[in-house]
From Swiss-Prot:
Protein name: Chaperone protein HscA
Short name of any one Pfam family annotated for the protein: HSP70
Keyword Iron-sulfur: no
Stated role: Chaperone involved in the maturation of iron-sulfur cluster-containing proteins. Has a low intrinsic ATPase activity which is markedly stimulated by HscB. Involved in the maturation of IscU.
Family according to the record: Belongs to the heat shock protein 70 family.
HAMAP family: HscA (MF_00679)
Alphabetized GO MF terms: ATP binding; ATP hydrolysis activity; ATP-dependent protein folding chaperone; unfolded protein binding
The keyword tRNA-binding belongs to this UniProt entry's keyword annotation: no
CDD domains: ASKHA_NBD_HSP70_HscA
Organism: Cronobacter sakazakii (strain ATCC BAA-894)
Keywords attached to this entry: ATP-binding, Chaperone, Nucleotide-binding
Alphabetized PROSITE patterns for the sequence: HSP70_1 (PS00297), HSP70_2 (PS00329), HSP70_3 (PS01036)
Stored NCBIfam families: HscA, PRK05183.1
GO biological process: iron-sulfur cluster assembly
Amino acid sequence: MALLQISEPGMSSAPHQRRLAAGIDLGTTHSLVATVRSGQPETLADHQGRHLLPSVVHYQAQGYNVGYDARAQAADDPVNTISSVKRLMGRSLADIQARYPHLPYQLRASENGLPMIDTPAGLLNPVRVSADILKALAERAREALAGDLDGVVITVPAYFDDAQRQGTKDAARLAGLHVLRLLNEPTAAAIAYGLDSGQEGVIAVYDLGGGTFDISVLRLSRGVFEVLATGGDSALGGDDFDHLLADYIREQAGIADRSDNRIQRQLLDAATQAKIELSDADVAQVNVAGWQGSITREQFNELIAPLVKRTLLSCRRALKDAGVEASDVLEVVMVGGSTRVPLVRERVGEFFGRTPLTSIDPDRVVAIGAAIQADILVGNKPDSEMLLLDVIPLSLGLETMGGLVEKVIPRNTTIPVARAQEFTTFKDGQTAMAIHVMQGERELVQDCRSLARFTLRGIPAMPAGGAHIRVTFQVDADGLLSVTAMEKSTGVEASIQVKPSYGLTDGEIASMIQDSMSFAEQDVQARMLAEQKVEAARVLESLDGALKSDGALLSAAERAAIDDAMAQLRAAAEGNDASAIEDAIKNTDKQTQEFAARRMDESIRQALKGHSVDEV
């Protein structure tokens, strides 16, 4: 008689051997939660069968609502209805007010300048609001899986910086979730498509969601997902389509008052509905604030064309970073609800010369990929051979003498990664070293972004260059950076975990990369000049000390020649001619060679003083 394996509907046939894990797509406009059941990834629906959860929270003095119930309150109570909070994550209040001047809810500044949202439930930061959304998703998963989650994978835009990633982890912690890891959204999509289709080669992941745009160029080979390059815009998405269309409707309807939050919410709702209708129809009817009219797809396309073009410029930069052409890309994966817009699909297809892939629901594909990864990380697939390699978007390094940046980890290096370099002291008797962590592609500190500063103290007093300090940069799988500095002879060390107080401004990453290309030649010249000035300062300081201690070894004429050479070097170092400084250094070296030899002879003579030849 055959034996049958019996399991509860929707549950594993070996429930006691499996751990419960979920993938969460914490989106700007909508969020989802997914899991793997019976070997198949699936998104989880609410009691009404709805898979998407609006990323909206409505606060009252007695409590709060999340999702559809909260969104329903937006028109009547916009001040206390928080949406698109993902855009506020990791940003300063000043940055938010400059970027989003028409937010309906009230913002206040905390003591450290970070934003707090004024609600009937009190002053809440974006981390707390995100935590409330995560709680709703976690509860949906617990009900569907009939148990508590052992771990989750949460997706974030590839361009989220350290502060934004840390804020996401903090929100999960507030929600009572154990984060197995953060996963870049495009990489999650690659996991979903890679496992389903088993393709190998170069793939572009075009992710246009509600509030962010990411483009990633990946190489898929034998289960290995390697991100060759990333790009995008952390403040561009379907919400911007809605705002442009809402402003257009406002003009057509002749609504001049911009202070009425209720009217603004009605306009946005009407714009969103029209955008959805125009994905399938050529004309959408609009009825808002007593005005009736129509919007054509052609009019909508004209409004959003500049934004779509911006995404394609990011695609071009990412391909260049990856060292591939558009013709090398085998498939283009479309992710995010905004990729349903016909103009987006059309322009992306034209750019890459192929029809984009949309076989997996673009709203669900990221959550599905996260669920697959969570299932592996929680230990349900110990035999999995899939390897995931993310990259850092901008180079990481240190400030060195002369205002130069020494890159320790170049951009597009796969993570997790650890790199170390050794540095020495610049001055005699130096007992401390300031460590200035930098991010960017340029050669000079003034052109890069400061991430953090700390000081290594307790360095033994030695001559310049005598102490050796090993600085280690470590980026974990979530993209968070730890920097440790250690003096090798004593083992004394200091470290810092980089958690910037707020994120990069709009387009800053893209402009930093572009500037490094545009100013490459000038940067090389500037670095050469700075290096020569640092070397000149080192030579002059060393000679000043030598002359003070051993100047008696020189005749008056020899001293005058050295003084003259040093004066010429000082004059050259004050200028901006690297070649002139280099020549002056060589001249000074030539004039001091005999002096150096005499100092060496004198040192040997003093060392042998009082000893016989036999003792030597």
